[in-house]
Amino acid sequence: MADLHQNQIIDKLHNIAFKDGTFLKQVISNIIIKHNNVGFSIDISGIDKLEVEEIKNTAIKKLNEIVGIGKITIVFTESKTVEKKPQKPKHFVENVKKIILVASGKGGVGKSTISALIAQQLSLENHRVGIVDADIYGPSIPHIFGINEVPQTVGGRIIPVRAKNIEVISIGFFVKNYSAIIWRGPMASKTIYQLLSVTKWDNLDYLIIDMPPGTGDIHLSMLENYHLNGVVIVTTPQKMSEIDVVRSIDLYQKLNLPIIGIIENMSDLFDGNSGSHLSQKYNIPLIAQIPVIPKIANACDKSLPLTDLLKLSLKEYL
């Protein structure tokens, strides 16, 4: 038979659910397929342990329906319960009225392009806007905005670069082109803190923060240390993308950050309907479903205005 794919595994487990309503696909991670042998982890934190063996047997039975599947290995994991600590006072960013995160569960979904589009759209609507490129894994905002200069420092404060009437600051300004960024979580979080707090913003209505993909140290640091107004989540229609986004939704809901809405990018390129499904399931607005527009990619490459090609309706959400 042909090699197995992750989507086949997810499809077979799609409707299996725990008694509390949690779908098995929401708590699966680390799917490994080798020579048609399959292995994955299931996070059983907070789930009745009496159900675990039953769910495991059901999953194995469903997976064995796949012709030619080999050995099936399921590992159960459980997050440690962390004692609640007294909440630290959160920081406001000087001269910034609202801070909006743009996040995604995984990389490669067009999050930076959407971040730039949101910033340019708000600027077009006569708001004073800034954008922070906090994506340490691939800072692309300077390129999208056509910036080649390094910010100046005056009196110990970083002066953001202005492009397309938007104030821009990026980790990419301080890293040589094509250099790998190898930072541990605390160092990366400290750098983001400096980008936010040491930068001299000029009375902004909105500060858009292009976050790294996933739910790592930087996300937790931002949520715990700053007054934030909300997050826009970017996804694609695939089921695998949906699984990653569910983890992001869970994080933001647990830490009480309002989820402004979901933007489904590349909506016509992949099978699935992730954005609409997540919107209905979690009662989160679906801001837009954006098809693949080759001219958008070209505009990013050539640092052209994105709002000439696509406009988002943001007024009812922000």
From Swiss-Prot:
Record has Nucleotide-binding as a keyword: yes
Superkingdom of the source? Bacteria
Q: By its UniProt entry, which InterPro entries does this protein fall under?
A: Mrp-like_CS, Mrp/NBP35_ATP-bd, NUBPL-like, P-loop_NTPase, YlxH/NBP35
Query: Which residues does the annotation say bind ATP?
Result: 105-112
Q: Which UniProt keywords apply?
A: ATP-binding, Hydrolase, Iron, Iron-sulfur, Metal-binding, Nucleotide-binding
- Entry-linked SUPFAM superfamilies: P-loop containing nucleoside triphosphate hydrolases
Per the UniProt record, one Pfam family is: ParA
**GO BP terms, alphabetized:** iron-sulfur cluster assembly
Quote the function comment for this protein.
Binds and transfers iron-sulfur (Fe-S) clusters to target apoproteins. Can hydrolyze ATP.
Name the family the entry cites.
Belongs to the Mrp/NBP35 ATP-binding proteins family.
Fill in the subunit field for this protein.
Answer: Homodimer.
Q: Which PANTHER family does the record match to this protein?
A: IRON-SULFUR PROTEIN NUBPL
HAMAP family (alphabetical): Mrp_NBP35
* Protein name listed in UniProt: Iron-sulfur cluster carrier protein
What is this organism's lineage? Bacteria, Pseudomonadati, Pseudomonadota, Alphaproteobacteria, Rickettsiales
